């Protein structure tokens, strides 16, 4: 009897809760707006502003570096510091906000956009949100460089400081609490980043590899029109994945190489599919290389949630000692390249690819062409990576300034003569490299 009553109750409950289809009748023709007029008007206006920004962005310039020690190799920097916010994240934030508005994640009623950032995405998101009149809050580490804080604020962003490991969780918490939208650049980059060719279409693709191909094609002095290697690090993983997807989709003969920092988990995530069930707690060693790598987060590497790095479109991955990247930053600074530590890491991996191709007598017969990105300016790091006191304290385990100078000498020697800086550095320079 009890079971019969329970079944009757559940049946009645289900019928009460069941949704009914909208019916066509002589008194009603179903025809309503899915999006209110005022919202459609706001969305159209916001998207038009973003496309106007894309046109102003144009193509960031490319600069060729030809190391004397590798006479058959060219390393191109695509200079993303030429954007309005001076970083690679300008085009990325543009893509993120365009995605969020297009999908209705950000609307005219959104109280604010919140995101976790190490600085560069924050300044670019602040710029883009200000462009469409949506308030923006950057949730940053409590020890973020003062130069980056100033940069975010200069574009209209507000700063919320938290412990670095809590940035993602706190950004989501603040967004939920204040009826805002958590952009989650790490999880949503793969949804937002463009990876299609656009030809001469009026609304041109923002894919950085697309621009590279267009620029090399137009350069009459450039014989090699398609790069042999594209080298880049990963923060969200969005940029390098968008390039990898583009290369795979169109069958381009370019190898996509992930450059990773010393204690980052990305190398092992890509090569061995590790750390999908384990965080980097106890592995990550600060300061690392600003803006890139994975390890300080309290969560494992979860695709679509904590990262957008698409491992299946990466051809190679390579790690470099952090102190060597710092040394490279000093070399590039002295040569007039105003670039940050992630750019220096990219260059270092590019230089080693040139060495490998020379040492292995590669089958590549034409002039080896490597393209990497100049991600942000060295100006942001005058108080850190370009400051000897900070280097001495932060990289004490690797010899501090003395260790940096050791690597600097070997890397400069490689640029000049084509020698192997990596093997020499691991044996000759201070640090815990001996097994």
From Swiss-Prot:
This is Putative pyridoxal-phosphate dependent protein F13B12.4. Pyridoxal 5'-phosphate binds at residues 235-239, 342. One of its GO terms (biological process) is cysteine biosynthetic process. GO terms for cellular component: cytoplasm. Residues 1-18 form the signal peptide. Gene3D superfamilies: 3.40.50.1100. Pfam families: PALP (PF00291). The keyword Glycoprotein applies.
